[in-house]
Amino acid sequence: MFVYYCKECFIMNKQQSKVRYSIRKVSIGILSISIGMFLALGMSNKAYADEIDKSKDFTRGYEQNVFAKSELNANKNTTKDKIKNEGAVKTSDTSLKLDNKSAISNGNEINQDIKISNTPKNSSQGNNLVINNNEPTKEIKIANLEAQNSNQKKTNKVTNNYFGYYSFREAPKTQIYTVKKGDTLSAIALKYKTTVSNIQNTNNIANPNLIFIGQKLKVPMTPLVEPKPKTVSSNNKSNSNSSTLNYLKTLENRGWDFDGSYGWQCFDLVNVYWNHLYGHGLKGYGAKDIPYANNFNSEAKIYHNTPTFKAEPGDLVVFSGRFGGGYGHTAIVLNGDYDGKLMKFQSLDQNWNNGGWRKAEVAHKVVHNYENDMIFIRPFKKA
């Protein structure tokens, strides 16, 4: 009995052991399946996430390329500027500010190449956006043009063919008069061919009857007046012209430097002639200033050119600022009707061909057309 019981117990234990082993296998299998499913699900999620990220990157790249293409097309149609866009860059992380005064990107001035570094903030694909300063954008061109316009307004330079660029000074319109004993405003106004009220307004004088000795007054430069010349008979006039022409022949084919500056200028020749007549040269920053910077009341008569005007031998001719790089030109008339139609005259010129400053152009004869803005100065004296 005992043996049988033990065998039966042994058989039962063995069967129970098999059942437990089967349960354990099933449990392990279920656990393995669960882990496998979990891992598979995780990998699927990761793959799905990666796919979404790539889709987003692709969308950004596509949008960026479309944006770049549209901007390039717009630039071709308007300013023909070129912008190099290498790669797909997040436009929201790129700060490019352009205005009429400056063009700065991330603290760098636009006159250098602007390069946005390869960082996560600036690039999603590890590429760079490069803007070359040799290919300016529309805003930069506008800023440059405005700056040039501003500089041109501030700068007033006239090209001088002889000495390069000089700042040109206009002839003064007023001069200073010092009040002397016995002066009155009416006498001063009469002397300078103006009115009492004009002097009052220019100098802020409240009482025209009250001025002081030594007081400085601004008065006009002597205007172009035409005093009555002395009548000369035809015989005397012919003799005077002959004597003038004979003197001018002595100036021809020689270089003249009256003031010792800038070589043989046109002004020098005229000053040599005027000094021969009156013992002094003429004032003026440039040749075109001669009629306005000198008092010719007792020395000459001023003429403006008209269709019927005929210059005489010995007259000074003054060209406007359209000649001589803004300084004008001056010469001495030899023949006032060179072509017989009052269209041309012949004169003795120096530096007409810009060779005087090198002392390479002596005084010589030149035929000119009458210009409507010419002024002629006829001295009362004859050489």
Curated annotation (Swiss-Prot):
Organism: Staphylococcus aureus (strain MSSA476)
Annotated signal sequence range: 1-49
Keywords in alphabetical order: Cell wall biogenesis/degradation, Hydrolase, Secreted, Signal
Major site of localization recorded for this protein: secreted
Function, in words: Probably involved in peptidoglycan hydrolysis.
Name of this chain's protein: Probable cell wall hydrolase LytN
Its EC number(s): 3.-.-.-
Residue ranges of every copy of the LysM domain listed in the record: 175-219
All copies of domain Peptidase C51, residue ranges: 241-378
Major enzyme class: hydrolase
Record-level GO BP terms: cell wall organization
Listed GO CC annotations: extracellular region
Molecular function terms, GO-annotated: hydrolase activity; lytic endotransglycosylase activity
Subcellular location: Secreted
SMART domains the UniProt entry points to: LysM (SM00257)
Pfam assignment, any one: CHAP
Ranges annotated as spanning the membrane: none
